[in-house]
């Protein structure tokens, strides 16, 4: 996409599964990434991954087997509500309109299959990411690791320090995992404070 848009270098801002995609891109193409913001989700194979997997809130990482899709088919909203409720500081902040919207999308043919496939790929992701770190070393670009106060919190920066040399941490107060729904103002402010100074400096020069 960057090539199509003729963009040589970009800042990355990622959340959840996006962190994993972003980490792989940043590791493989460090010259294409200026700064990297990861929001409230661990990256497989980075830091104490096996210990992270023991967190009972991450039960879905290991929710697999031949019948999982049939168990959820037609009950997508029930399954998804557990995520929105358990991972929120205040479940009401993930509003009904958003819940209905995402539940309809996940009820489409193949959607839940793809969702489960993401989690099933984590073991291979961990192997690949450890190999990348072994071959290329830690990320060198500035990294901001944001955690929701009621979610990964300070653990985000601690874990990402195992995968990057220049890590800054930030906490979004009163927020769980869904930080853009729960505290968008603080989230945008944290991201802008990290990214904008570099852009301002480039503009002045």
Each model region followed by its residue ranges:
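Flexible "cap/lid" subdomain of the alpha/beta-hydrolase fold that forms the substrate-access gate
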Residues: 1-13, 17-171, 180, 192-205
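Catalytic histidine-centered segment of alpha/beta-hydrolase-like enzymes
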Residues: 175-184, 188
């Amino acid at each position: 996409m960057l090539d199509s848009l003729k963009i040589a270098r970009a800042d990355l801002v990622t959340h959840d599964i996006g962190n994993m995609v972003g980490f792989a891109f940043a590791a493989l193409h460090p010259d294409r990434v200026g700064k990297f913001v990861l929001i409230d989700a661990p990256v497989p194979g980075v830091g104490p991954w096996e210990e992270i997997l023991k967190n009972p809130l991450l039960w879905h990482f290991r929710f697999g087997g031949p019948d999982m899709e049939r168990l959820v088919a037609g009950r997508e909203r029930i399954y998804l509500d557990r995520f929105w409720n358990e991972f929120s500081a205040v479940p009401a902040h993930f509003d009904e309109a958003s819940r209905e919207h995402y539940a309809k999308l996940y009820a489409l043919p193949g959607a839940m299959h793809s969702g489960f496939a993401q989690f099933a790929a984590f073991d291979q992701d961990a192997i690949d990411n450890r190999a990348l770190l072994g071959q290329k070393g830690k990320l060198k670009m500035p990294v901001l690791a944001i955690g929701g106060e009621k979610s990964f919190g300070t653990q985000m920066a601690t874990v990402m320090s195992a995968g990057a040399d220049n890590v800054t941490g930030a906490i979004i107060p009163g927020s769980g995992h869904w930080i853009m729904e729960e505290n968008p103002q603080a989230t945008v402010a944290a991201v802008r404070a990290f990214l904008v100074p570099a852009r301002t400096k480039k503009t002045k020069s």
